[in-house]
Amino acid sequence: MARFRLLLVNEFKLFRTAIPIHLVAIFQPTVMYLLMAAILVHPTFDMYVDKSATEEGRALVAAMEEVGSPIGLPYINPILVDWDGESVSRQVIAVGEQGGALTAVQHYGLIDSNLVKNFRNRLTAAALRLWDAELGSRAVTVEESPWLPRDVPYTVYFGMALLPMTAFLAASIMGAILTAQEFEFGTIVEYTLAPASVVLVLGARLTRLVLSALISAGILLVAVGLTTGFWPGSLWRVALILLPVTVIAGCLGLLAGLLMRRSIPAFLVGLVGSFVGWILGSGFGLAAGFGKLYEAISRLTPFTHATQLLFAQYYGAGIGRPVASVFFLLVTATVMLVLTGLAYRWRVMRQG
């Protein structure tokens, strides 16, 4: 135990050999989240409406104010403006007579087709309320049946899905850099001659990587909680879910460092693996919402399984098959541990 403690202390001292990498690994995901949260889609859209003197125009604005989630925020924030009929930044609605009929014309600026769809759908929802009032018994009633008891903003999901990537990124790139540096600085010989067993050496390094990765994820978790007001139901369960993810990532970093023996290539393995896995692993939405092919591919990554397990902690509702996800994470972590042990024995003995 004393030998393991000395190895662990030495692992943390290695922070001084790659300070920029450690800072990037620990803080970059949180900084990215805070920047992205400022531009991510918000359910309430500011929609500009040209001031209308007609009763119908005022009725449309009133209907727009009624459009919203039955359990959360409104979908439209109508803003009355004096439109000159020419310049449009995003969109503006002008109510006027065309062909003898009162018409609401939605003018668009330079925006993408997805934003056009969002603006159009909100205007249609407001118009439907006007039609229903006129149609009486023939009205088309549209009811939203929420799955959850309250609306959860997308920034919560984005931050939640970023937690596995945060832990993975920190463990993988730190493990890759530290291990590759052992070869670049020639200190790998010390491990070859050391009386400590492979289990102690790898155990100390993985413990350090796991703790560092959990700290990085913890910083992001606090940032998500402070900015959204949403906190997980159980912090220790979140840590348990992320634990096998950090082990898998740490082993990937160690393998990259052992096999490549160069800092930059090993670092790129961890970096690319983290971002590709995050994108393919439900990073922007639940895998089932992107088609069967994407869902099948995403289940090959630890990110989707971790995200599905984290979902219950943030939303209070379970999705997927939790037992299968836990099994996948544990088996993958075990396989990676075995491969890392074999690679370490082969590479260190060969170096000696």
Model regions: which residues?
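Extracytoplasmic/periplasmic domains immediately adjacent to an N-terminal transmembrane anchor
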Residues: 1-155
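Junction motif at the cytosolic side of a transmembrane helix
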Residues: 9, 15, 41-43, 259, ...
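Transmembrane helix boundary and interhelical loop/hinge segments in multi-pass membrane proteins
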Residues: 15, 172-194
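Transmembrane helix segments
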Residues: 33-44, 260-300
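Transmembrane helix-loop junction
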Residues: 37-38, 177, 181, 224-225, ...
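Membrane-interfacial helix-loop-helix junctions in multi-pass membrane proteins
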Residues: 148-152, 281-338, 346-347
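Long, hydrophobic alpha-helical segments
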Residues: 155-177
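Alpha-helical transmembrane segments and their short interhelical loops
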Residues: 198-271, 275-278, 320-326, 330-341
